[in-house]
Amino acid sequence: MRKFSLAYLTIPGTNPMDQIRIAKECGYDSVSLRTISMHLPGEPEFLLDKDPALFAATRAALKEYDMPLMDIELARIRPDLDVSEYESAFEKAAELGATDVLGSIWTRDRAWYTETAARVADMAKQYGLRYNIEFLPWAGVRNLQEAITLIDALARDNVYIMVDTLHAGRAGVTAEELARTNPKYFNFIH
């Protein structure tokens, strides 16, 4: 049975408590929160690992609305970011029952991003999280084939491709190509 989670970018800038309430009111099965800083000017941050009051309010809202937390985002791999800083976000997500983390890669240095993605995957696994890598045509992993190559290189049982249909279309990925791809690579779509 297909389930639907309210992704953060559907209503960007919305605090976790309101996003959880909106997800419930709209009939979603779960919610996806952005709890990792994007380091973008003017973007609100909802860092559950750094703000105990926000964490408690988010936990209370999940319970009040009986709304599971599916995933957190966005664990980016970029040369100027230290991925070890994601661990506290993964820990708090797991405490709230999350099953997944969404990530993306922003460098073309394949050896470096493969090694770094392995670290993120292993860190996520410590908290029972699946690591879902999104490809974008202007990022480091630009298309479905590059994502498959990375997943195969990582050889970990908690790493998947997250297909954002908007970006897949921009990358020239067809429905036929997706249908021909082994479903073992996929966990969820946007």
What is each of the regions a protein language model found here?
Residues 1-100, 125, 156:
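N-terminal pre-domain/capping segments
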Residues 3-6, 119-190:
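Acidic/histidine-rich catalytic cores of soluble enzymes
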Residues 7-11, 34-38, 74-77, 105-108, ...:
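Active-site beta-loop-alpha junctions enriched in small/polar residues
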Residues 16-17, 83-86, 114, 144-145, ...:
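Conserved strand-to-helix beginnings and helix N-cap segments that scaffold or border functional pockets
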Residues 53, 108-120, 140-143:
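Active-site-adjacent beta->alpha loops and helix N-cap segments on the catalytic face
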Residues 93-111, 127-136:
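Active-site groove signature of glycoside hydrolases
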